[in-house]
Amino acid sequence: MAQKRDTYKYELKQGNKVVYVGITDDPGRREQEHRNDGKQFTSMTIVGNASTRQGASAWEEQRIQTYMDNHHGQTPQYNKNETGK
């Protein structure tokens, strides 16, 4: 049986700066959770189409690693580690 493609990949940005990379099955709810947690961002951008949870998790890890490669080993401001967890 095929896996559901119900997981969205997204980035939170403050202006043009990526401050968080994540995945969710409910973008509207997740955006509100981030705001309620006090994260400062100007936009939430959905990246590509919905994916399987496994595919989205792999994208998340790779996207954070690419960010780190381009920012002297630093994760986006609100990501706690390179896996997005």
Put a short name on every predicted segment.
Residues A2-K85:
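Structure-specific nucleic-acid interaction/processing domains
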